[in-house]
């Protein structure tokens, strides 16, 4: 459709001054044309009474390259789950990026950006950084420079099972390469070595630690619950700390302790892939719901899946309800519920409010589309403890 008017919603886009006040949004030719009070309807009309209206959600950590073992179709992880833009976190490297781009990215309804793996083969085989010969810096730079409209960062995994005996060496090279290219480096952290502090120390402004609140030994918190000194120094120079829930990388206890210590996340992401999109992660809205249950304010959580990731990766036209921005919008209810959700350690949290996406509005070119999500009572069907334990045991081999 060419025009769409969303009426009577609670506009929530804190980055540009909308904090839940009632208002309307007009979309025309794939862009937001007007935001504010009572707007004269044009084209199709959505009555958003009782719902929040936000910029389209952005998930900065997914795996949507189907050629790798963890990969799954981007639209399954994106618009079908209420997220209009996703970033693939290192599934492809310089050797296979063009296959990912031509075979998947170009055909997706969901907006897809890539963080190129510093390892040339990406995540085709795992253990991708246990040999420096697996890194081709020149090919990496050439690939990024040829596709800067899609490749918005680099990715490296800093786990013992990935780097082997090389420790910090491949991560330091990834950071050096990203800094020379002028793009962020996202680093997966998990079981050490290398030590988390050593990883943070090679990062600079704009780089991102994902899986920050994993709960494994050697994590972001000291025994007394305070953040480690390297994390404090890193944040001071602009290193960002992301959630990256995943199948083994988010613990309610760790996050709550960090929140109490004043060390909140900078961004919220899922690490969605084939092993967790049916639980315990499900989707970005569910991950947001979990953080809210742990104490994150709604407005802050929405900012961390809209304007913040857009700023981190320079995603022009995304992340705000403002004239001229791309017409990607979420309409969600903030339902009162009484359910229990699991983290990646089988621990649970009582959920009282659910971010329940009702409509995902996405625009490509001059056309705007609406995906309505089933209006059924929310039932997350948490994965059984036995099944989750089996998944975690398998994930430990790679994390």
Predicted regions and their residues:
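Divalent-metal coordination cores built from histidine and acidic residues
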Residues: 76-159
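His/Asp/Glu-enriched, well-ordered alpha-helical/loop segment
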Residues: 253-334
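C-terminal cap of metal-dependent C-N hydrolases
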Residues: 326-379
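Divalent metal-coordination and catalytic microenvironments
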Residues: 9, 25, 30, 50, ...
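N-terminal metal-binding scaffold of metallo-dependent hydrolase/deaminase domains
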Residues: 1-40
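Active-site core of metal-dependent hydrolases
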Residues: 156-278
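Di-metal (Zn2+ and/or Mg2+/Mn2+) metal-binding site signature of metallo-dependent hydrolases
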Residues: 51-73
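Active-site metal-binding motif and surrounding structural segment of the metallo-beta-lactamase
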Residues: 38-53
């Amino acid at each position: 459709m060419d025009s769409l008017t969303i009426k009577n919603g609670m506009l929530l886009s804190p980055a540009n001054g909308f904090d839940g006040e009632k208002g309307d949004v007009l979309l025309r030719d794939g862009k937001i044309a007007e935001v504010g009070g009572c707007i004269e309807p044009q084209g199709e009309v959505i009555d958003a009474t009782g719902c929040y209206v936000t910029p389209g959600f952005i998930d900065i950590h997914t795996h949507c390259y189907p050629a790798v073992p963890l990969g799954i179709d981007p639209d399954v992880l994106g618009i079908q789950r209420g997220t209009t833009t996703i970033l693939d976190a290192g599934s492809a490297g310089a050797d296979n990026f063009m296959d990912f781009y031509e075979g998947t990215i170009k055909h997706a309804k969901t907006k897809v950006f890539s963080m190129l793996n510093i390892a040339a083969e990406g995540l085709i085989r795992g253990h991708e950084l246990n040999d420096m010969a697996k890194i081709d810096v020149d090919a990496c730079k050439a690939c990024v420079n040829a596709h800067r409209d899609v490749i918005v960062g680099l990715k490296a995994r800093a786990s013992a099972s990935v780097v082997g005996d090389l420790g910090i060496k491949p991560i330091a090279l990834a950071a050096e390469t990203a800094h020379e290219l002028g793009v962020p480096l996202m680093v997966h952290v998990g079981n050490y070595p290398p030590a988390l502090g050593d990883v943070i120390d090679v990062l600079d402004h704009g780089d991102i630690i994902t899986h920050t609140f994993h709960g494994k030994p050697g994590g972001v918190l000291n025994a007394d619950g305070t953040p480690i000194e390297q994390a404090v120094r890193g944040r001071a120079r602009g290193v960002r700390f992301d959630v990256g829930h995943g199948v083994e990388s988010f613990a309610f206890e760790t996050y709550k302790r960090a929140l109490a210590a004043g060390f909140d996340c900078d961004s919220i992401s899922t690490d969605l892939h084939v092993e967790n999109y049916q639980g315990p992660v499900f989707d970005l809205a569910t991950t947001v719901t979990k953080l809210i249950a742990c104490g994150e304010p709604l407005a802050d959580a929405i900012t961390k899946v809209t304007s913040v990731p857009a700023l981190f990766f320079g995603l022009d036209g995304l992340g705000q309800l403002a004239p001229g921005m791309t017409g990607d919008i979420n309409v969600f209810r903030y339902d009162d519920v009484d359910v229990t959700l699991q983290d990646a350690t089988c621990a649970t949290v009582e959920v009282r409010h659910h971010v329940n996406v009702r409509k995902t509005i996405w625009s490509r070119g001059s056309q705007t589309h609406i995906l309505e999500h089933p209006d059924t009572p929310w039932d997350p069907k948490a994965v059984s403890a036995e099944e989750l334990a089996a998944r975690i045991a398998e994930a430990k081999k790679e994390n």
